[in-house]
Amino acid sequence: MFQALKRDKAFYSYLVRLTAPIALQNLITFSLGLIDTLMVSQLGNNEMAAVTAANVPVFLLISIVFGVQSGVGILISQYWGKRDLKSISRAIGVASFLGVALALVVAVVLFLWPVQIMDLMSNKHHLSLLGAPYLRVIGFSYVFNMLSSIYVSAQRSVENSSFGMKLFGMSTVLNTGMNYLLIFGKCGFPMLGVEGAAIATLLSRVAEFVVCLICALRSRVIPLDWKALARPGGEMLRRFVKYSSPVLVNELFWGLGNSLLTVILGHTVISVEFLAANAVMGNLNRLFLVVCFGLGAATAVMVGKAIGEGQSREELMALSRTLSWVTILVGVVLAVVALALVPLLFQPVIFPLFKLEGLSAHLATTLAVTGFACIPFHAYSISAVTGTLRAGGDVFWSTALDLAPQWLIALPLTALLGLVLNADPWFVSLAIQAESFVKCPICLWRIRSEKWIHDVTLPEGQS
């Protein structure tokens, strides 16, 4: 470990410069979810449970956005290592056409059949009626979010990681203000409840897109070739499909798996309380993981650029070892801090703030302790799968490692304990986390094999 961590000051300074803005961007994004949850929770447990259930299909949209964003990032980071700006424009063009088409299809489905989709998420029909207006609107926000996320990924891949932080910081302030006005009907605006939360999100996503468009027209770091972007060509389409479609499938089915975990909680005997607790604790857990997501994204940029520059296998393996150990140590520190805060903040601050009491409060504590304890495992798997393996073009293995533990272990085990055996919530929450225990050792084995290193910019058969 100590040998792997022996790097000069310039290396760690560069890592921090990449990681910090991405971590802050994720913190802002997840804080937005927490603010939404906080405001909706003031309406009552039923409203919060309804939005949680509505966000199950929405999470699939988020996964599609992240999949396209991550997939195009694989190509752009390696093209950036070669300083091939025209190919970067082509990659952005392909991702934009395909990404918007996918997001639009899902948004239309959510708009046309919101109640029917909500009925699949929970066995409480009154929650479906509460969540349907939210679902009708929220899907279209991700059409705009798709375009802005692709541009943020491009900026991040060319080492301008602060762009996303600034963009999402702006949109979070706008979203929070519009939430307050539209959810509660302040300053002459109508009181729209959960539908107001969706409209506020849509408006903030439109604002993100407008800012990205203005920046794209003025950027000097990656001056876009608009002709190449509008007509990216068949070769780039094939390359994008080869290296990015597995990532998209990965994120789509991983998002579906996470959504099914929420569906399972929504069909337990204590579904309303479980959904309310999960809404709060899921957001808190993600807040503690923002640094890990930042390190994972920084790993992808550094590894992808190193491959594009033509660094040797020995240099790439040394880089991956260093980044892996850094992520693990950060995960351990975060887990210790998070667990220490449970007895200090939950009872006096978190529970009153989100109006959790009785069974909901007990379930929230259970989900928090198990989730926080597993942070080091999540940290390493994030760095390995979304960072090293994806940036190395090892998309088949990164997809298999992300999906197999979830679908073959976590989902069946959670369904068995939660729906069939009605087991204690402690065991159900541990089952939700089970995938990370299996994923980590297999990731370690794959990276040590050195078979993950591929130059995705080379012609077919030369990678």
Range-by-range predicted roles:
Residues 24, 28, 32, 61-65, ...:
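Residue-level hotspots within pore-lining transmembrane alpha-helices
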Residues 48-108, 145-164, 275-343, 379-398:
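Small-residue-rich hydrophobic transmembrane alpha-helices
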Residues 69, 138-156, 164-172, 197-212, ...:
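Short runs within selected transmembrane alpha-helices of multi-pass transporters and secretion channels
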Residues 27-49, 118-125, 181-192, 252-283, ...:
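Helix-terminus/linker motif at the lipid-water interface of multi-pass membrane proteins
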Residues 1-22, 76-141, 189-245, 303-374, ...:
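Short alpha-helical transmembrane segments in multi-pass integral membrane proteins
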Residues 17-33, 137, 148, 171, ...:
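Transmembrane helical elements of multi-pass membrane transporters/channels
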Residues 60-63, 175-179, 209-213, 286-290, ...:
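Hydrophobic transmembrane alpha-helices of multi-pass small-molecule transporters
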Residues 7-38, 42-43, 59-71, 75, ...:
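N-terminal transmembrane alpha-helices
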